[in-house]
């Protein structure tokens, strides 16, 4: 069985798709005004804002009350036939981004038995960054009694040959179009097509072949190859996994092979899609002795012929060569050094997206900045396979408004 499968997808039958679709709950956590606008915009209409708990509300006194209300609203939407069921289907999605490019994806479900978020996992589906396990229990409280799930998870495949999703895109005119509208709050256009029957079967066959050949792609690496990586929403998928494991623990010996909790709805995307841009995240260390830090880095983590990165101290800058033997990625070498150094020496690290902002911050007294290169797309899977996990803040996949909006759903009870 493939690790990514067609699902009985719940598709909303509502008058306003614009009011229905809401951005991922882990965005705009420090901007309550954003969520207030969303609630006001969707007031009185069926909307996913009534089915999710914005992350900003986790751990607040209102959490339990809001969670109970969410579950009641989910049950109400099901009872009132808000959804049309798309049996044994995928949904092909095209999302316009800020720069005008179109990101392609395929909504389906993953087998949680094929996913393990722990560091050093050898499962077919893995996390790209370290999972903060303390963040899972609050999310389990939201999911545990929910009758349906709505995904904001973006899962990635390393399909350089573009054999999985792209053939669906080429034949989309033969598919039933489900939606075409503008997402609220500047999310731009989104379109979706139903992929079922022969089109779904053809995708399943291509995925079977793709999975069988994954080992050849990474034959030069010591680690066990993987099929998919979780790009966005890993803590959401980890929550689904934890709820499933909890169910298994409470029902020893029960056959849960076809239980809805074994699966989770996600959107699969190809890292080699032209719209996928991996932006680097730079490092600045303040409240430190910058020259001492730089000297320690040269002594402990540098080697000739390594990854070249540029450092900035005040108005001075230069290049250093990081030891390739320590990681598949330059950021892996640097972050490993910084983690160890800051345990024994003074300094505070921050993660900066903009080049100019990093240089300006490094001009402060007692500061040093490191400008990192953008990660090549082919390095993502190789980095996880070889190193077990990517360093935190390795790369950024798009801006906040480009994250997935809640749209499709699936029964989990």
Per-range role (PLM):
Residues 1-413:
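Surface-exposed, charge/polar-rich loops and edge strands
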């Amino acid at each position: 069985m493939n690790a990514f499968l067609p699902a009985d997808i719940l598709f909303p039958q509502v008058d306003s798709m614009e009011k229905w679709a809401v951005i991922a709950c882990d965005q705009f956590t420090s901007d309550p005004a954003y969520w207030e606008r969303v609630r006001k915009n969707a007031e009185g209409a069926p909307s996913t804002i009534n089915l999710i708990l914005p992350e900003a509300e986790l751990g607040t006194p209102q959490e339990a009350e809001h969670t109970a209300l969410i579950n009641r609203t989910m049950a109400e939407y099901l009872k009132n036939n808000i959804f049309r069921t798309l049996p044994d289907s995928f949904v092909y999605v095209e999302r316009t981004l800020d720069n005008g490019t179109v990101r392609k994806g395929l909504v389906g479900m993953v087998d949680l038995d094929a996913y393990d978020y722990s560091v050093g996992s050898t499962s077919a589906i893995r996390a790209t960054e370290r999972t903060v396990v303390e963040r899972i229990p609050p999310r389990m409280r939201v999911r545990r009694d929910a009758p349906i799930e709505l995904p904001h998870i973006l899962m990635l495949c390393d399909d350089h040959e573009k054999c999985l999703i792209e053939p669906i895109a080429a034949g989309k005119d033969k598919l039933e179009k489900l939606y075409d509208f503008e997402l609220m709050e500047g999310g731009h256009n989104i379109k979706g097509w139903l992929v079922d029957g022969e089109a779904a079967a053809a995708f399943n066959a291509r995925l079977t072949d793709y999975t069988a050949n994954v080992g050849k792609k990474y034959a030069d690496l010591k680690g066990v190859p993987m099929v998919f990586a979780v790009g966005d929403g890993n803590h959401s998928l980890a929550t689904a996994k934890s709820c499933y494991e909890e169910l298994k623990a409470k029902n020893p010996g029960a056959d849960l092979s076809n239980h809805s909790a074994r699966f989770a709805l996600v959107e699969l995307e190809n890292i080699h899609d032209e719209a996928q841009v991996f932006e680097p995240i730079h490092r600045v260390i303040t409240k430190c002795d910058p020259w001492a830090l730089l000297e320690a880095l040269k002594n402990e983590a540098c080697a000739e012929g390594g990854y070249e990165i540029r450092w900035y101290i005040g108005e001075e800058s230069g290049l250093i060569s990081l030891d390739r033997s320590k990681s598949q990625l330059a950021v892996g070498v640097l972050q490993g050094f910084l983690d160890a150094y800051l345990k024994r020496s003074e300094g505070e690290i921050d993660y900066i997206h903009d080049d100019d902002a990093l240089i300006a911050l490094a001009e402060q007294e007692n500061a040093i900045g490191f400008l990192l290169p953008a990660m090549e797309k082919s390095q993502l899977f190789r980095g996880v396979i070889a190193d077990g996990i990517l360093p935190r803040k390795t790369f950024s996949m798009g801006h906040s408004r480009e994250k997935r909006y809640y749209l499709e759903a699936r029964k989990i009870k």
